[in-house]
C-alpha cells in the first residue's frame, strides 16, 4: 500500500471519549511549514467541520481511502517544542483530559485562537434568490447577508433569526448557494511601533538637506534629530521636530530615511525598585542554603522540604538559592499560592535580579501575560515568578523550582485539566535534572510522610530570623462568651487586645475563615459537631431537607435541634466580613479599618496592602488573603474570629488546612522588633488541632494526623479518586451514579486492581449539589494511583460517554481533590 507524508494532530473538537492523535495528509504547499508544535486547521467529524489542532509528530503512514488533509497552518513557527508536547501527553495520561486541553493550559491565553464560522454568498444575490426558491426561511437569510455585505458571522445570523437559521443555512449550503468557512483569529496580536532611522550616512544626509534648510526646515530638523538620537519611534520624531507624517513619507521616498517595525512588549510596570541589600544568612539559614545548593550543583532530580517556622526567613534562602542557580548558568522558577502575594514577592526579586525576572499570574492583563511569555521564550528572562500557571513558562536550562507555601490547596487546579502543580513540578525536575524546593511552616501530611520515608530531603529553620519569640497565643472560648452575655463576633479577650494595640499605635490583622460557614452545625454550649460514623469527617447540613450528609460515603441522618451530648441548642456558625466590620465600627468608632476579601478587592489587593503599610491603618480585616505571606513590622496582634469553620467541613484535609491556616495567620504578628500576640476564637478550645496551632507545634499535629490517615486509609496511605456525574435531571444523575458505582466495583475485582485493596463509596451529593442548573453526584474510589487504576478510570469515562442512556450527562474524575 502507498505510504504518504502525514502528521499526527491533537484536535480541539475531539472530546475525551474519542481523543487520540489523528492522522492527516500534508498538502505539498504546506510540507515545509507542517512541523511538530504548530497549530493547524483540520476537517473533523462526519461533517468535516473545521477545527483547530496541534501537530504532535510527522510520520510516514499508509494512505487510506478517505484520508483527510490539513487545510491551513496557523503559526509561522512552533508554539510548543518537543518538551512541551511531551508534557501535554503526560498530562493527558495523568489528569484525564484531552491532549488539546493540556496544550491550552500550557500556552498563554493570548496565543489562543478564536474560531468564527463565516457564511458567504457563493453567487450573485439575484441568482441566489432564484436558486433558493422552495427553501423555507431562505429569503430572510439572504436579506440579512446582503445587509452584511455578502457574508456574516454565524453568531450574527443566530441573533437575528434564532433557531430558525440552521435549516435554511444547511439547505443553501447543499444547494451551493452559500459557502461556510471557519476563520481563526488570535485572541491577542503582537504590538509594534513604527521606527525611523537615516537611510544614508550622516554626512550625505546633511549634504542633501542643508541647501534647502530655509525652504524645507522640517526635513533638516529630522536629519539633525536622527543624527543625534539614532533609530527612534516615528511619533517621537514628529513630536520633537514638528515634521508631519507626510513629510516623513516624502523623505522615505527620497531615500533619506527608512521605516521599520519594532516589537513593543506590554510588560506590567513596577515602580522604581531600589537594589536589594546584601543577603546575610544566619547560621541555620546558611546550613539549609548549602544543603539545597549542593543538590542544585549535582544536576540530579531532587526534592527538598524547607521546613521553617513563620518568620524564619525562607524568602532570604530562596533569594540566595536563585542567585547561585543563575551563577551556574541555569534558570529558576518561584511559585506562590496566591495572586495577592505575587507583587510583594516580585518587588523583592526585582531588587536583586532586575528585568531578568518575569511575573506570570491570572490577574495580569492577557496582553501582559502573552508578552511576558514571549520574553521568557526568547531567553530574556532567568527567573519566573508567579502562581501555579507559571509552571508552564518555556524556561530553558531549568535548574531550580521553588514552591512557597507548598501546603496550599490553590496549587491544585479546579478546572480541566485538574492538575496538581506539585506533581507537574516533580515531572519537570526529573526531565530537567533540576532541584525542587517545597517551602512551608506547615507542610502537607503527604510531604512530611515522603520526608519520613526518605523520598524527600529536609532542611530545617527552627527559629525566627530576627530571633524574636513566636507570638503569644490566647484561646478565647466562645461558649463562655455566650454564657457571659456576649453573643457578638468579637470576644472580650480580643476586644481588650485590640484596645491595647490602638493605644500603643500598633496594627492588628483580623482573619475570618469563611470556608463552609453556612453549612456547619455546632453546639453553642459544649462545642459538639456531628461527624460521619464511617469517615470521621464533619457532616454537611442541607437546609433543603433538614438533613446532615457525608459527601464521601453518602451517610445521611436528620439534623437535630438539640445536642445529643449535652442537650444544648445546635447553631449554624458563620458570618461575613461586612457584619464583622459593622461590629468593629461600633466598638471602635474612631479607628481606621480596611476590609480585604474577594468582594472588595477586584484588582486592588496591592493597593489595600500598601495603604495598610504606608498609612499604618490600625485594623486590617480579611479572609484567606490576609492569612499568609504578608510581612508588616508594625503588626503585633492577630485575631482569628472563628477557628472552627474550616475544621469541621467534610474533607479529609480539614484538620491539616485548619492547622496550617491558624499557624500562618498567627505568624503574621511580631515580625518586626516587637513581640507578637494572637487571639484564637473557638467553640472547641480543647480540640487538639487548635491547641497544636496555638503552640505552633507541627510535630505533635503531624503525629496525630498521620495516625488518623493510616486508620481511615486516607492519603498518603491510599489515593482518593472522586468520580462525579453531572446533569440537569437529578433523578437521572443519581441513577447514573449508582450504575457507575456498580461498574467500578466490578472493575475493581480484576487481579491487577484487587492487589491495591480498592473500595468504592457512594454515591453522595457533591458538597454543592447544584451548579449552573446541573446536579452533581459522586462516587469515591479508595485505591492506588497506579497505571492500571488510571487506565481503568480512563476507560470508564470513555464508556460512560458512549452510552446513549447518559446523553446530556458528564462524568469527570479528580485525584485527591482539594475540595
Give short role names for the model-derived ranges.
Residues 1-440, 452-468, 782, 787-819:
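Accessory, non-ATPase domains that flank or precede helicase/AAA+ motor cores in DNA-metabolism machines
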Residues 5, 20, 38, 330, ...:
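Residues at beta-strand starts and edge strands
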Residues 39, 60, 756-787:
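Short, intrinsically disordered low-complexity segments
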Residues 178, 257, 357, 475, ...:
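Generic structural signal for residues in well-ordered beta-strands
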Residues 272-282, 286-293, 299-734, 767, ...:
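Inter-lobe coupling/hinge segments of SF2-like helicase ATPases
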Residues 353, 588, 747-753, 803-804:
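Short helix-capping segments at alpha-helix termini
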Residues 594, 747-766, 807-815:
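Short beta-strand elements
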Residues 731-746:
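Extracytoplasmic/periplasmic
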Amino acid at each position: 500500500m502507498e505510504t504518504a507524508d502525514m502528521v499526527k494532530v491533537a484536535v480541539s473538537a475531539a472530546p475525551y471519549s474519542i481523543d487520540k492523535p489523528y492522522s492527516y495528509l500534508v498538502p505539498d504547499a504546506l510540507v515545509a511549514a507542517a512541523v511538530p508544535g504548530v497549530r493547524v486547521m483540520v476537517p473533523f467529524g462526519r461533517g468535516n467541520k473545521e477545527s483547530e489542532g496541534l501537530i504532535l509528530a510527522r510520520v510516514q503512514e499508509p494512505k487510506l481511502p478517505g484520508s483527510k488533509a490539513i487545510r491551513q497552518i496557523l503559526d509561522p513557527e512552533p508554539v510548543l517544542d518537543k518538551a512541551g508536547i511531551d508534557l501535554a501527553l503526560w498530562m493527558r495520561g495523568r489528569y484525564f483530559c484531552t491532549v488539546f486541553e493540556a496544550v491550552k493550559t500550557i500556552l498563554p491565553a493570548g496565543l489562543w485562537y478564536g474560531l468564527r464560522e463565516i457564511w458567504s454568498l457563493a453567487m450573485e444575490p439575484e441568482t441566489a434568490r432564484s436558486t433558493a426558491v422552495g427553501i423555507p426561511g431562505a429569503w430572510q437569510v439572504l436579506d440579512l447577508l446582503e445587509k452584511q455585505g455578502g457574508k456574516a458571522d454565524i453568531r450574527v445570523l443566530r441573533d437575528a433569526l434564532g433557531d430558525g437559521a440552521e435549516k435554511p443555512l444547511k439547505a443553501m449550503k447543499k444547494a451551493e448557494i452559500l459557502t461556510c468557512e471557519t476563520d481563526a483569529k488570535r485572541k491577542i496580536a503582537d504590538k509594534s511601533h513604527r521606527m525611523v532611522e537615516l537611510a544614508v550616512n550622516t554626512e550625505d544626509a546633511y549634504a542633501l538637506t542643508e541647501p534647502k534648510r530655509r525652504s524645507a526646515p522640517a526635513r533638516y530638523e529630522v536629519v539633525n534629530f536622527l543624527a543625534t538620537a539614532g533609530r527612534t519611534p516615528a511619533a517621537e520624531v514628529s513630536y520633537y521636530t514638528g515634521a508631519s507624517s507626510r513629510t516623513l513619507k516624502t523623505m522615505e521616498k527620497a531615500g533619506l530615511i527608512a521605516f521599520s517595525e519594532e516589537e513593543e512588549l506590554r510588560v506590567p510596570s513596577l515602580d522604581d525598585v531600589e537594589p536589594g541589600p546584601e543577603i546575610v544568612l544566619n547560621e541555620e539559614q546558611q546550613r539549609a542554603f548549602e544543603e539545597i545548593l549542593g543538590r542544585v550543583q549535582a544536576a540530579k532530580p531532587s526534592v527538598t522540604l524547607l521546613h521553617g517556622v513563620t518568620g524564619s526567613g525562607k524568602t532570604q534562602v530562596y533569594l540566595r538559592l536563585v542567585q547561585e542557580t543563575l551563577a551556574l548558568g541555569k534558570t529558576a522558577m518561584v511559585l506562590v499560592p496566591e495572586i495577592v502575594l505575587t507583587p510583594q514577592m516580585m518587588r523583592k526579586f526585582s531588587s536583586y535580579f532586575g528585568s531578568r525576572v518575569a511575573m506570570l499570574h491570572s490577574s495580569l492583563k492577557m496582553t501582559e501575560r502573552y508578552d511576558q511569555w514571549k520574553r521568557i521564550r526568547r531567553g530574556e528572562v532567568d527567573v519566573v515568578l508567579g502562581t501555579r500557571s507559571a509552571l508552564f513558562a518555556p524556561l530553558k536550562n531549568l535548574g531550580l523550582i521553588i514552591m512557597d507555601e507548598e501546603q496550599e490547596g490553590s496549587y491544585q487546579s479546579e478546572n480541566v485539566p485538574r492538575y496538581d502543580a506539585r506533581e507537574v513540578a516533580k515531572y519537570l525536575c526529573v526531565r530537567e535534572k533540576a532541584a525542587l524546593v517545597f517551602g512551608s511552616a506547615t507542610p502537607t501530611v503527604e510531604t512530611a510522610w515522603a520526608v519520613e520515608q526518605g523520598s524527600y530531603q529536609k532542611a530545617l529553620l527552627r527559629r525566627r530570623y530576627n530571633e524574636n519569640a513566636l507570638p503569644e497565643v490566647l484561646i478565647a472560648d466562645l461558649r463562655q462568651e455566650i454564657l457571659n452575655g456576649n453573643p457578638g463576633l468579637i470576644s472580650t479577650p480580643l476586644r481588650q487586645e485590640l484596645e491595647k494595640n490602638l493605644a500603643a499605635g500598633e496594627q492588628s490583622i483580623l482573619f475570618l475563615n469563611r470556608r463552609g460557614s453556612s453549612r456547619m452545625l455546632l453546639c453553642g454550649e459544649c462545642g459538639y459537631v456531628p461527624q460521619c460514623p464511617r469517615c470521621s469527617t464533619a457532616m454537611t447540613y442541607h437546609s433543603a431537607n433538614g438533613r446532615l450528609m457525608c459527601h464521601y460515603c453518602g451517610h445521611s441522618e436528620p439534623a437535630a435541634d438539640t445536642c445529643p451530648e449535652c442537650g444544648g441548642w445546635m447553631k449554624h456558625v458563620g458570618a461575613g466580613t461586612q457584619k464583622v466590620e459593622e461590629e468593629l465600627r461600633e466598638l471602635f468608632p474612631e479607628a481606621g479599618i480596611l476590609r480585604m476579601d474577594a468582594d472588595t478587592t477586584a484588582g486592588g489587593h496591592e493597593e489595600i496592602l500598601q495603604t495598610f503599610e504606608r498609612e499604618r491603618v490600625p485594623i486590617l480585616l480579611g479572609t484567606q488573603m490576609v492569612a499568609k505571606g504578608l510581612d508588616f513590622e508594625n503588626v503585633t496582634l492577630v485575631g482569628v474570629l472563628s477557628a472552627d469553620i474550616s475544621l469541621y467541613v467534610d474533607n479529609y484535609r480539614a484538620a491539616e488546612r485548619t492547622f496550617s491556616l491558624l499557624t500562618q495567620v498567627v505568624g503574621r504578628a511580631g515580625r518586626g522588633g516587637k513581640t507578637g500576640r494572637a487571639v484564637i476564637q473557638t467553640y472547641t478550645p480543647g480540640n487538639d488541632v487548635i491547641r497544636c496551632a496555638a503552640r505552633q507545634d507541627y510535630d505533635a499535629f503531624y503525629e496525630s494526623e498521620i495516625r488518623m490517615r493510616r486508620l481511615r486509609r486516607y492519603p498518603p496511605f491510599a489515593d482518593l479518586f472522586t468520580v462525579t456525574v453531572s446533569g440537569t435531571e437529578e433523578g437521572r444523575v443519581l441513577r447514573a451514579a449508582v450504575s457507575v458505582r456498580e461498574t467500578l466495583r466490578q472493575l475493581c475485582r480484576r487481579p491487577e486492581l484487587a492487589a491495591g485493596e480498592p473500595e468504592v463509596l457512594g454515591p453522595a451529593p457533591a458538597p454543592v449539589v447544584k451548579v449552573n442548573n446541573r446536579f452533581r453526584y459522586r462516587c469515591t474510589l479508595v485505591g492506588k494511583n497506579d497505571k492500571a487504576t488510571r487506565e481503568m478510570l480512563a476507560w470508564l469515562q470513555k464508556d460512560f460517554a458512549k452510552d446513549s442512556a447518559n446523553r446530556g450527562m458528564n462524568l469527570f474524575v479528580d485525584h485527591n481533590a482539594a475540595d
